[in-house]
Amino acid sequence: MKKNIIIGSRGSILALAQANLVKDRLQGNYPNLSFEIKEIVTSGDKDLKSNWENSDISLKSFFTKEIEQELLDGEIDIAVHSMKDMPAVSAKSLICGAIPDREDPRDVLVSKNGLLVTLPQGAKVGTSSLRRAMNLKTVRPDFEIKHLRGNIHTRLKKLETEDYDAIVLAAAGLKRTGLADKITEYLNGEVFPPAPAQGVLYIQCRENDEEIKEILKSIHNEAIAKIVEIEREFSKIFDGGCHTPMGCYSQVNGDKIKFTAVYLDEGKQIRAVVEDDLAKGKEIAYMAAEEIKNKIVK
């Protein structure tokens, strides 16, 4: 077995935090092996004008193409991606080797002026996400939504120094980068469904690398994988891209799932709630999508 395993990751603070979480889990499971992180610059990192980091769903391959190429070329053994950055189909000869434990999928408010309901009339709230913006406006139509780009630290700095009363971010990014203390309020996932697969990591490897596949089994969470399959299918049904305003929130109790989905159409929040057996898998996504499509037609 190869003794030195190289993990490929983007070089952002969040990406490296995620890669280190994976590295630490693997190192704990395989203390006799050495795990090393290699930083890789992606198209998304180069294109500063269109910095999509921490937005809902990136352009397909925007943050993954170069990392996948290094995996194909044998320069790295494992790739760590945010699931939301992954296209529906992996590059040829690459597979998902593991989906580890999920971080909190909810969105959060980071505020100078209190909770969502106590923010002043006409408060200026920053987000780069159309889904988040439209969800906010359904609850607080008085809000002025201001465009906000940049990585997590850049966004927090803009909140401090620019004309924002609050910003909305993913809980997962703040928690993974040690910034959970910045969170003012966790937004109710049933009212503000997050992006599909938010807070989920996608651990990729070569399809023919049996040793790495075996190693990655040690951090795979099959229960999370089943939920992600449903959420990703819902996204796929609506052709989920970076400008598709939709979200979903999964709550599992035993073998049952409560799947809350939302699609924002012409400023209106169209919702569906499906409560059924988790074993139905992708069928849950189709049930929710059908309910939403019927409401759109009406």
Swiss-Prot record:
User: What biological-process terms (Gene Ontology) are attached?
Assistant: heme biosynthetic process; protoporphyrinogen IX biosynthetic process
Name what cofactor the protein needs. Answer: dipyrromethane
What pathway does the annotation place this protein in? Porphyrin-containing compound metabolism; protoporphyrin-IX biosynthesis; coproporphyrinogen-III from 5-aminolevulinate: step 2/4
Domain of life from the UniProt record = Bacteria
Enumerate the GO terms in the molecular function aspect. hydroxymethylbilane synthase activity
Q: Cofactor note from UniProt?
A: Binds 1 dipyrromethane group covalently.
Q: Where are the transmembrane segments?
A: none
Supply the Gene3D superfamilies for this chain: Periplasmic binding protein-like II, Porphobilinogen deaminase, C-terminal domain
Residues the record lists as S-(dipyrrolylmethanemethyl)cysteine modifications: 242
A Gene Ontology cellular component where this protein is annotated is: cytoplasm
User: What SUPFAM superfamilies does this protein map onto?
Assistant: Periplasmic binding protein-like II, Porphobilinogen deaminase (hydroxymethylbilane synthase), C-terminal domain
Catalytic activity annotated for this protein? 4 porphobilinogen + H2O = hydroxymethylbilane + 4 NH4(+)
Keywords of this entry: Porphyrin biosynthesis, Transferase
Q: What is its EC number?
A: 2.5.1.61
Write out the similarity annotation. Belongs to the HMBS family.
Q: What does this protein do?
A: Tetrapolymerization of the monopyrrole PBG into the hydroxymethylbilane pre-uroporphyrinogen in several discrete steps.
Q: What is known about its subunit structure?
A: Monomer.
Instruction: Name the HAMAP family for this protein.
Output: Porphobil_deam (MF_00260)
- What is the official name of this protein in its record? Porphobilinogen deaminase
Q: Which organism is it from?
A: Fusobacterium nucleatum subsp. nucleatum (strain ATCC 25586 / DSM 15643 / BCRC 10681 / CIP 101130 / JCM 8532 / KCTC 2640 / LMG 13131 / VPI 4355)
Instruction: Tell me the lineage of the source organism.
Output: Bacteria, Fusobacteriati, Fusobacteriota, Fusobacteriia, Fusobacteriales
